[in-house]
Amino acid sequence: MELLPPLPQSFLLLLLLPAKPAAGEDWQCPRTPYAASRDFDVKYVVPSFSAGGLVQAMVTYEGDRNESAVFVAIRNRLHVLGPDLKSVQSLATGPAGDPGCQTCAACGPGPHGPPGDTDTKVLVLDPALPALVSCGSSLQGRCFLHDLEPQGTAVHLAAPACLFSAHHNRPDDCPDCVASPLGTRVTVVEQGQASYFYVASSLDAAVAASFSPRSVSIRRLKADASGFAPGFVALSVLPKHLVSYSIEYVHSFHTGAFVYFLTVQPASVTDDPSALHTRLARLSATEPELGDYRELVLDCRFAPKRRRRGAPEGGQPYPVLRVAHSAPVGAQLATELSIAEGQEVLFGVFVTGKDGGPGVGPNSVVCAFPIDLLDTLIDEGVERCCESPVHPGLRRGLDFFQSPSFCPNPPGLEALSPNTSCRHFPLLVSSSFSRVDLFNGLLGPVQVTALYVTRLDNVTVAHMGTMDGRILQVELVRSLNYLLYVSNFSLGDSGQPVQRDVSRLGDHLLFASGDQVFQVPIQGPGCRHFLTCGRCLRAWHFMGCGWCGNMCGQQKECPGSWQQDHCPPKLTEFHPHSGPLRGSTRLTLCGSNFYLHPSGLVPEGTHQVTVGQSPCRPLPKDSSKLRPVPRKDFVEEFECELEPLGTQAVGPTNVSLTVTNMPPGKHFRVDGTSVLRGFSFMEPVLIAVQPLFGPRAGGTCLTLEGQSLSVGTSRAVLVNGTECLLARVSEGQLLCATPPGATVASVPLSLQVGGAQVPGSWTFQYREDPVVLSISPNCGYINSHITICGQHLTSAWHLVLSFHDGLRAVESRCERQLPEQQLCRLPEYVVRDPQGWVAGNLSARGDGAAGFTLPGFRFLPPPHPPSANLVPLKPEEHAIKFEYIGLGAVADCVGINVTVGGESCQHEFRGDMVVCPLPPSLQLGQDGAPLQVCVDGECHILGRVVRPGPDGVPQSTLLGILLPLLLLVAALATALVFSYWWRRKQLVLPPNLNDLASLDQTAGATPLPILYSGSDYRSGLALPAIDGLDSTTCVHGASFSDSEDESCVPLLRKESIQLRDLDSALLAEVKDVLIPHERVVTHSDRVIGKGHFGVVYHGEYIDQAQNRIQCAIKSLSRITEMQQVEAFLREGLLMRGLNHPNVLALIGIMLPPEGLPHVLLPYMCHGDLLQFIRSPQRNPTVKDLISFGLQVARGMEYLAEQKFVHRDLAARNCMLDESFTVKVADFGLARDILDREYYSVQQHRHARLPVKWMALESLQTYRFTTKSDVWSFGVLLWELLTRGAPPYRHIDPFDLTHFLAQGRRLPQPEYCPDSLYQVMQQCWEADPAVRPTFRVLVGEVEQIVSALLGDHYVQLPATYMNLGPSTSHEMNVRPEQPQFSPMPGNVRRPRPLSEPPRPT
């Protein structure tokens, strides 16, 4: 025993009550997402043109005299549009061979090739002429020249010129065959007075065989526009690689002294063709030569700032280029890229593969490659290859274009000739150029399909088209973790992908999507997607946004006042929403446009806040409370002190913020007023305080009750001027822990709200601290009494009793009694320890005073009074013996008094048996004397003690003797009639199933008499005789039944199974399970019951010590083959290994020399659970019934852990032993699911199925799992709570599957707690994966049992609940039997049967 030091003042209060911060403490303004300041669902309508077919190519022209045009090519047609996208001219480009083909006619009379549609592959401008050149997929890929003829601001096309000379072209050498049907990219460069076409085409074996295209070539346009000059330079994929090595040319452009092509191609001619990467090919724009052709691998990766687990070190690669564009960059991006402003940068959108499928990162990434750096890397690669010393083994590469070679040798040569230069041959630079995603993965799921980059002011903007037909205009920056959107809008409702090629015309970009061409302003389509004034005026200057009343727009869109210099403040929330009419309130305003500087400093006189008629004085911002706001969120806070004026009235009012004379910020100044409703002035009222006394140590939990106690932001409870620590604040109640007092005295107690005292006069009395000196006894059980002795025990409002087992603590409060002694009850605690009790510390505390702890306190299970009637005394007996489970274990903990007829007897305990010698002075009359047992002050009359006199026998005893005699006579008469009839049939029914083994197998099957569940010889009911096969006889075959109660068992005649025929290795393995048949005595006239697989007899087993042990013997009649016998023996070996208090153990298996196997099981004197709960003589409580289910759950949890599936869990298959412990039985035919996942009953076509206990999926698929056992457990709980009512009694078994599939389930029984019915519903979930496990069910049912206070929760009537009319065999009760009335009212608590026995 030890004394505990005093606790902190509020410790006990915090134990009893969950802590809750007072109103106003640490309140923060709700963050407004940054996305809330914009709306990307705003519809913008931009000019568009419908081309009449999928747009294949597009190019724009701007002349020197303000003439401009847009050229749009679709299949078989070329459109000429004006700058407003109005059609100016249309030209037929196909089909080839069609008389209406205008371009075909330019080549003279045909035929010029095979007929077919013309898909435009090349559409470029020759700026020198100027002229438009188009090349299609027909006519061997020839091109046509269209001179441009300006007509005002519009442009027309002259008659086309055919760039094809028949006499200069032949199949093996065709300089005028330019376009490939697989795709061609062309860039036109003016050199001197000539135009050179830099052409790159995708090839395969079929295209290469049709005419003579080239992969890369430089062709000069003839001056007479008759075609291209022969003898052009070219590179082509070698014929041996045409099948496996495909090159896609994505983009081409000209800048500075070079022309560049961007390709997607396999990484190597020897590797997997699907392993792609991106390359940049560079050609000289000043010399039409290919000797300085260079390639460089571009590497784009996504490398997040915080690398994900499992991600590669260098970031996730995105090797496939989807679209690219080059442009000069603005100052900000140039600084981040470490280049000069205005330098050209190549931007590319990359994906993970050809299909652009999602990876672990974003769908698309954007990388930037400065052109100067690209050229530098290429030049350095040339130096490494051609300048000494050359690294050995350095390859020239491009093996798909040329013969393999090592640097510095030319292709195909082993040495460099003096007349040749290493630099005059194509080269793949050995190093790659690597960059990371500019957007750091922020594009996320967006799939970018088009890209165009522009410089606006100092800002670099990427204009991107997406797979779903949207346009994103985003500022390109690297230093942010969010996207700076100029706009994000949809081009239309079709949602078709935006195509790769984008053209610019003046201040507009032309995007193509499906058959539409859209004209999008570079500055964005508008400003309406900005929703707040602050966001509107912070937009880029080039957008021209301004605030127009209550919306953002461009000046041309605003009919009223439009300005760009100021915004009003905006209130969105404030706290608190109420304040005291007297006293101050610290008011926090939330919103935007309060400040324009990060410091949040408010100049004097700029901000005015009024609440109703009362001013609110601005407070300086507390820098210690400043918290960083994520850039994706925004919120501003403003605090002021509100002190109501004397004229302020109680009630609701408005909060108003006015900002004037604020100095301008970077983008605008704040000026205006914002008003928000919802504040109320209230008058707090204190009505009651309790308790008004407590110990000097403090810690007393004060409860202050009243009205409007939570108004404002500050309140204080003062006890003698010292603050009482608040633990909970609500509108009607305050809870606090008193501070320590200096002396024993009465001190003032007051409440202040907002610094003003609430009217009322209260006094608190400090008393002497309670001192606990002892706690007794040192053991007990739930709700048993504990005595606390000490001094000043009534100084505390309540003493608290706490039990701690080392892991958790439970508490109960003691009611006030005497200052020196208090009687308390132990708290609720469930003992789960296998030893039957739990040791821990029992403590007593009084508020904040020092406590007392009793170590080593033993917590025991509560005792359970018996429910069986007392046995009459024999004449020679002078003591009463009765069983009282758990009473002996608690004898040292509580007071126990046993009386007979009001006279006390000197009782003694022998385990759970109580022996009570009768007092000598006791006279037992004819009606006997009542036996009463009082335990810890609670008394129960267990029955009446009677002793039969010599003059007569009590009527009840006489009936008990005569009724069995009459039943025996009736049984003998029935047996004689049956024997006579059987002899006439010349068949003898053997007395047990042993003799059936020798019957002739060809004789067929003979049915046994019907034995219903509970057809037990011990019940005194005779077995009905059979006169032939009646309507109850089973038809041999597959069938369904509600339960095995209604089944009959046919006996199969079969050949004898010899013990010597069994596998010797198996017999050796199961020798510990087998019991010699000489040690087993079967009482074949004592039938306990029957099942589908056999009959159960009462028997005896003689162990090795010659002790006769009662047992139940189950003879199996359905095993017909030797393999089944061997399988049964192996299963018996598994069953022998099961050991759990709630699982029926297997004594052994007896296999006679000739005959069928017999199973020996422990004898259960109380029979099965169904018979028990249906019996009118039993009176279990709700807690008893649920505890039976808890024991079943524990047994099933064990079987599930052992990987057994029961398949037939029901109340009829659970047994009760002499201590009323439930044992799960009839799992012997369960299948070990270690062998296979589930067991199919289709393997046993004669098995009768307990369909009304089966899970839905078992009814549908005939498969069983542990989760189908969980369903059956739910039905078993329903049986228990209805005391054995048949489930689905009005549903035909063949309709049950449809009934359950509709979601319908068994109704909630009348006395079933809601929490238990919820457990049943969880067991009946249609999806087996959603059902709980048995481990979870054990925990949930344990909680339900522990929540039922006491052992006797509700008195159940002895009549059956929820049962309609039924046959006698369904109820296991004859219809003529009288109903039993409820227990007499003077019986306070019947003997509960629920708790399993605990070892003492």
UniProtKB/Swiss-Prot annotation:
Residues 31-522 form the Sema domain. It catalyses: L-tyrosyl-[protein] + ATP = O-phospho-L-tyrosyl-[protein] + ADP + H(+). It is found in: Membrane. Pfam families: PK_Tyr_Ser-Thr, PSI, Sema, TIG. It is an enzyme of class 2 (transferase). In its inactive state, the C-terminal tail interacts with the catalytic domain and inhibits the kinase activity. Upon ligand binding, the C-terminal tail is displaced and becomes phosphorylated, thus increasing the kinase activity. This is Macrophage-stimulating protein receptor. The lineage of its organism: Eukaryota, Metazoa, Chordata, Craniata, Vertebrata.
